[in-house]
C-alpha cells in the first residue's frame, strides 16, 4: 500500500531535505530542520503523490487516508503534549500547501484548525487569555470560510466580492466605529461577538453553517489545500514559471504555535542574507502579538529584525535584536546552522510563543539577479560552494535580469523624488499607472509600459504583476507578497510607500499632495525605492565586474559554442562584446531593409522585374559591389571568428514594389509602363510563398542569383586576406531537400572561387554547408553530408514544417492549444523535444554516419532558449546561434547543461 503520510517533530522525522519531490519543499525542509535539532512544532506531511491520486480519483481522498492522518496525529500529540479535539488540553493545527518548487502565496493555508465550541473553553482555561483564543477563532472563521467553504467549492461571488473581503470589511467597519487603529485594540468580548457575527455572515452568503466539528475542519482543510493546486492564481503562476501541472502539492498539517498571545509573542519572516542586494547580513521583519499571515500579507508594516533591516519606513520601530536579544541570538545561531547545512541563502518563517522560538519553515530564498551573483561569489569565498556551483546558482532568467535597463542616473538627478518606499525589486521602470491587474494586462497587450499601483498585492494579482513593468504598493514590507514575487521575477518593485493613497472608486492616486489618475506616468527606481512623476531616460545597467568574472567562469565549464544571429557590423560587435564566438546566421536580405538600403533595393528590384536572363545578369552585376562591401564590413569586424553567410532565402515577391506609387517609380526607372510592372509583380505572387520559390530553389531556377552572391563573398574574403586580415567564411544553402540541390550550388561555388582566386592571387579557404529546415532533409541527412561540411538546423522553419503551423497565422491557435494543455508550450519559443527535437537528433546522427567530423549547429530562435539549449547539448550540437542580447544566457545554459551531465558520472 502506498505510504501517503510522513511524520516529523521532536528532532526526528521520516523525511529529509532531498525528498522534496515527494514531500514538497516545505515538508522536506521541516523534516530536515527536525533532523538538525531545531525547534520545529511537530506535524505530518501528506505527499504530492496523494495530491495526484486525489485528482485522479475525481477529487476524492484516497481510501484510508484520514485513518493514516489520525494515526500520525497521535505522534504529534505525544510530542506536543496536547490532544486534538480535546476539551481540556486542545491541540490546534494549520493546514499548509508545499509544492516541490516554491510558489509563494499561490496556494491556500488555514490556521487554527480545531477551535470549536467544544475546545474553546478548555483553551481559555489553559492559557488564561480569552482575547488570544477569540482572536484565533475569528481568524479561523475568516480563513476557513474563504479557503474551504468558498474557493474550494468553486463558488464565484455574485458581485465579485468574496467572503474574505466581506468579513474584512466588517472588521474594518467595526474598528472604525470604535476609533480603533489596530486589531490589537479589540477586546476579548468584542472578538467573541465578531466571530459570531462572522459565522452568521458566512451562513447568509454561502448558505452553509461554519463547521463546529474539529475532525470535519481537518478533512476540509486538507481537501482545500489539494484543490488550491488548481486554483486560478496557482495555475497562472505555474504557467509563468514553467512548473508542470502534474507535480501536485503536498499538505503539511502542523501543530499551531502562536505569535498572538501577547507582548512576549511574535511572528516573523527573515532571509539569511539580503535578498535584494546579496549583502551578508541577517535580513527580516517581525510583528509582536501577530500571526504569520499579518507579515506576509503586508497588512501591517512590520518592524525590523535588526539594524541592517531598518529603513525610512521602520527606522523608529524597535527591532527584535533590541527587544528580545536572547531570542534574536538563538535565531542567529539557527541562521548559521541552516546556511552551513544548505550552503545557500534561506527564507525562514518563525514564531515566538511566550518567549519560546519555533521554526515554521525554511526554503531556498528567492533573490534578485544582482543578489544571486553577489551571494554566489561570497559563498565561494566562504568555501560554502565551489566554482561549478557558482555557475549553477545563477538562473538564465537572473542573468537576463542583470542586463536589464535602469534609470539614467544623470537624468534622474534633474527630477525631484515625490515619494520613497522600500526597494523590493531591482532596476528601473517608467510607465503609466494601472490600478488593477486587469488594466496592467490590457496595457501590456497594447504594448504600453505600465506601473501596477496597489494598496498591497495579493496572489490574485499575479497575472497583472507579470504584465506590469513595475510595481508600487502603499503597504507591506520587504517580505510581503509583492516583494517576494517581484524579486523572483527580477521585476522593478517598491513596497511600503505610505505616501501613496488610492481612491479606487474615483480612480485617483494621491502621492504627497500630488493627484494622479490611471494612465498618468510614473517612474520607479526599484534599487533605491524612489518614485518620480517624470519620464526619466532608461539605460543599460552599468557593466558589473562580477558579471564579467562570472561569465569567464561560465566559459570554463561550457563545451558547446555560442554564436549570434547578426546582419551588420554593429550587431556583430555587440554580440562579440557579449561573448559570441562568431556569426551563426548572416542574412544578406537585411541589407535591403532600413538604413542605407534605398540604392541596393533599387538594384534588387531591377533584377526581380527583369524580363530576360541578360537583363537579370546586368542588374545583378550592378548589385554585386553592394553585397561584397556589406559582407566585407562584417567579416572584418569578426576577424578570425567564423561568419556563416546564408544565401538569399525569402521569396522574391517580398522585395517587389508595393502600391501604385512605388510601381510607377520603378516603371519610370526601367523605362517600361506601369501596367507592365504590375503584371510582372503579380506574376511573382504565390498562394503559399513560404513553401514556394525561395531558398536554394531561387539559386537553381536562377543560377545567376547564386553566382553574384558567391562572387561577392569570395571577393570580400580575398580583399581582406590581401589587407592582412583573417576572414573565416562559411556559406550556407537554405531550404535543401536533397544532395542534388547542394551539388548544383557547390559546382557554381567551385567555378566562381577559381575565378576570384586567379583574379586576386590568393587561395581561399571556406566551409560549405546547408540549413536543415525541412523534415525530409533530416531523413536523408546521410546523403546531404556527402557534400555539406556543416549542418545548421533552422528550427523556426523546421518547427513550422513539422507542425504544419504557419508562424504568421498561428498565434491564437497555439495559445489555445497551450491553455487546453494539448501542447505543453509554444513550440516557436521552446523546442518541441518529442517531435522537432527528434528530427534534429536524427539529422545529426545520420549526417555524422557519413561525415564523422560534421559540424552541427542551430540558428533558430531556440538557440537562446535555456531549455532548448540543454536539449541541443545532449543532441551533440557543436554550437547554438541566437540574437546578440541572448548570447550570455545561451552561454550560461550551455555551461549548466555540461555541469549537469558531469554530475551524472
Residue ranges and their predicted role:
Residues 1-415, 423, 441-442, 448-451, ...:
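Nucleotide/phosphate-binding sheet-loop regions of phosphoryl- and nucleotidyl-transfer enzymes
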Residues 44, 474-476, 495-498, 586, ...:
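Short beta->alpha connector loops at strand-helix junctions that form conserved
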Residues 96-97, 543-545, 553-905:
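Conserved alpha/beta-domain cores
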Residues 420-460, 511-549:
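Extended, non-globular alpha-helical segments
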Residues 504-510:
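Internal gly/pro-rich beta-alpha loop/helix module
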Amino acid at each position: 500500500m502506498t505510504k501517503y503520510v510522513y511524520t516529523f517533530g521532536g528532532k526526528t522525522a521520516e523525511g529529509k531535505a532531498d525528498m522534496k519531490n515527494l514531500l514538497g519543499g516545505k515538508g522536506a525542509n521541516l523534516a530536515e530542520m527536525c533532523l538538525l535539532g531545531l525547534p520545529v512544532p511537530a506535524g505530518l506531511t501528506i505527499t504530492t503523490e496523494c495530491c495526484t491520486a486525489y485528482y485522479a480519483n475525481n477529487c476524492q481522498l484516497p481510501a484510508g487516508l484520514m485513518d493514516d492522518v489520525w494515526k500520525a496525529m497521535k505522534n504529534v500529540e505525544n510530542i506536543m503534549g496536547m490532544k486534538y479535539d480535546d476539551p481540556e488540553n486542545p491541540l490546534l493545527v494549520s493546514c499548509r500547501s508545499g509544492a516541490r518548487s516554491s510558489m509563494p502565496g499561490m496556494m491556500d493555508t488555514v490556521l487554527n484548525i480545531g477551535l470549536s465550541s467544544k475546545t474553546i473553553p478548555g483553551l481559555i482555561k489553559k492559557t488564561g487569555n480569552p482575547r488570544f483564543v477569540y482572536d484565533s477563532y475569528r481568524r479561523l472563521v475568516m480563513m476557513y470560510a474563504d479557503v474551504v467553504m468558498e474557493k474550494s467549492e468553486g463558488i464565484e461571488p455574485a458581485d465579485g466580492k468574496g467572503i474574505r473581503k466581506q468579513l474584512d470589511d466588517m472588521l474594518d467597519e467595526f474598528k472604525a466605529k470604535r476609533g480603533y487603529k489596530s486589531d490589537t485594540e479589540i477586546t476579548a468580548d468584542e472578538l467573541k461577538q465578531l466571530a459570531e457575527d462572522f459565522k452568521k455572515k458566512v451562513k447568509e452568503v454561502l448558505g452553509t453553517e461554519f463547521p463546529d466539528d474539529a475532525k470535519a475542519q481537518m478533512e476540509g482543510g486538507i481537501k482545500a489545500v489539494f484543490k488550491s493546486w488548481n486554483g486560478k492564481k496557482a495555475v497562472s503562476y505555474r504557467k509563468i514559471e514553467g512548473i508542470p501541472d502534474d507535480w501536485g502539492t503536498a499538505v503539511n498539517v502542523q501543530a499551531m504555535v502562536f505569535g498572538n498571545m501577547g507582548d512576549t509573542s511574535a511572528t516573523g519572516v527573515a532571509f539569511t542574507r539580503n535578498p535584494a542586494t546579496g549583502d551578508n547580513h541577517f535580513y527580516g521583519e517581525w510583528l509582536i502579538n501577530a500571526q504569520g499571515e499579518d507579515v506576509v500579507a503586508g497588512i501591517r508594516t512590520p518592524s525590523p529584525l535588526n539594524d541592517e533591516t531598518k529603513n525610512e519606513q521602520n527606522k523608529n520601530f524597535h527591532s527584535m535584536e533590541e527587544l528580545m536579544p536572547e531570542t534574536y541570538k538563538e535565531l542567529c545561531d539557527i541562521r548559521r546552522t541552516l546556511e552551513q547545512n544548505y550552503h545557500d541563502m534561506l527564507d525562514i518563517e518563525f514564531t515566538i510563543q511566550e518567549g519560546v522560538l519555533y521554526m515554521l519553515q525554511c526554503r531556498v530564498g528567492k533573490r534578485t539577479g544582482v543578489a544571486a551573483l553577489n551571494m554566489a561569489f561570497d559563498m565561494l569565498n566562504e568555501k560554502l560552494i565551489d566554482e561549478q556551483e557558482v555557475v549553477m546558482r545563477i538562473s538564465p532568467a537572473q542573468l537576463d535580469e542583470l542586463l536589464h535597463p535602469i534609470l539614467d542616473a544623470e537624468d534622474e538627478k534633474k527630477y525631484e523624488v515625490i515619494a520613497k518606499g522600500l526597494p523590493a525589486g531591482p532596476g528601473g521602470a517608467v510607465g503609466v499607472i494601472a490600478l488593477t491587474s486587469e488594466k496592467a494586462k490590457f496595457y501590456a497587450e497594447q504594448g504600453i509600459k505600465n506601473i501596477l499601483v496597489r494598496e498591497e498585492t495579493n496572489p490574485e494579482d499575479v497575472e497583472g504583476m507579470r504584465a506590469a513593468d513595475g510595481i508600487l504598493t502603499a503597504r507591506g514590507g520587504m517580505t510581503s507578497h509583492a516583494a517576494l514575487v517581484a524579486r523572483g521575477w527580477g521585476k522593478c518593485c517598491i513596497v511600503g510607500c505610505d505616501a501613496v493613497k488610492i481612491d479606487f472608486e474615483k480612480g485617483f492616486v494621491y502621492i504627497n499632495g500630488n493627484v494622479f489618475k490611471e494612465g498618468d506616468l510614473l517612474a520607479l527606481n526599484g534599487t533605491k525605492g524612489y518614485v518620480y512623476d517624470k519620464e526619466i531616460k532608461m539605460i543599460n545597467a552599468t557593466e558589473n565586474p562580477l558579471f564579467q568574472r562570472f561569465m569567464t567562469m561560465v566559459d570554463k565549464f561550457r563545451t558547446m559554442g555560442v554564436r549570434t544571429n547578426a546582419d551588420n557590423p554593429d550587431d556583430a560587435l555587440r554580440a562579440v562584446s557579449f561573448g559570441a564566438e562568431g556569426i551563426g546566421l548572416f542574412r544578406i536580405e537585411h541589407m535591403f531593409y532600413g538604413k542605407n538600403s534605398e540604392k541596393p533595393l533599387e538594384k534588387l528590384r531591377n533584377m526581380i522585374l527583369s524580363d530576360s536572363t541578360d537583363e537579370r545578369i546586368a542588374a545583378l552585376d550592378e548589385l554585386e559591389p553592394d553585397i561584397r562591401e556589406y559582407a566585407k564590413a562584417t567579416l572584418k569586424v569578426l576577424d578570425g571568428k567564423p561568419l556563416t553567410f546564408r544565401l538569399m532565402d525569402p521569396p522574391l515577391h517580398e522585395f517587389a514594389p508595393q502600391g501604385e506609387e512605388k510601381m510607377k517609380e520603378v516603371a519610370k526607372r526601367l523605362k517600361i509602363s506601369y501596367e507592365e510592372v504590375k503584371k510582372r509583380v503579380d506574376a511573382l505572387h504565390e498562394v503559399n510563398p513560404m513553401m514556394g520559390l525561395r531558398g536554394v530553389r531561387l539559386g537553381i531556377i536562377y543560377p545567376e542569383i547564386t553566382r553574384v552572391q558567391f562572387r561577392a563573398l569570395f571577393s570580400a574574403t580575398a580583399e581582406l586576406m590581401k589587407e592582412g586580415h583573417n576572414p573565416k567564411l562559411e556559406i550556407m544553402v537554405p531550404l535543401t531537400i536533397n544532395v542534388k540541390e547542394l551539388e548544383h550550388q557547390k559546382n557554381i561555388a567551385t567555378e566562381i572561387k577559381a575565378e576570384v582566386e586567379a583574379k586576386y592571387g590568393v587561395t581561399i579557404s571556406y566551409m560549405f554547408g546547408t540549413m536543415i529546415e525541412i523534415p525530409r532533409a533530416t531523413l536523408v541527412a546521410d546523403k546531404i553530408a556527402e557534400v555539406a561540411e556543416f549542418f545548421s538546423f533552422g528550427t523556426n522553419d523546421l518547427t513550422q514544417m513539422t507542425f504544419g503551423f504557419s508562424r504568421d497565422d498561428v498565434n491564437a491557435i497555439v495559445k489555445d492549444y497551450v491553455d487546453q494543455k494539448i501542447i505543453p508550450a509554444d513550440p516557436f519559443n521552446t523546442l518541441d523535444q518529442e517531435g522537432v527535437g527528434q528530427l534534429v537528433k536524427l539529422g545529426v546522427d545520420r549526417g555524422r554516419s557519413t561525415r564523422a567530423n560534421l559540424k552541427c549547429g542551430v540558428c533558430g530562435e531556440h538557440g537562446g532558449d535555456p531549455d532548448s539549449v540543454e536539449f541541443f547539448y545532449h543532441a551533440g550540437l557543436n554550437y547554438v546561434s541566437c540574437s546578440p542580447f541572448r548570447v550570455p544566457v545561451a552561454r550560461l545554459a550551455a555551461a549548466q547543461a555540461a555541469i549537469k551531465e558531469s554530475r551524472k558520472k
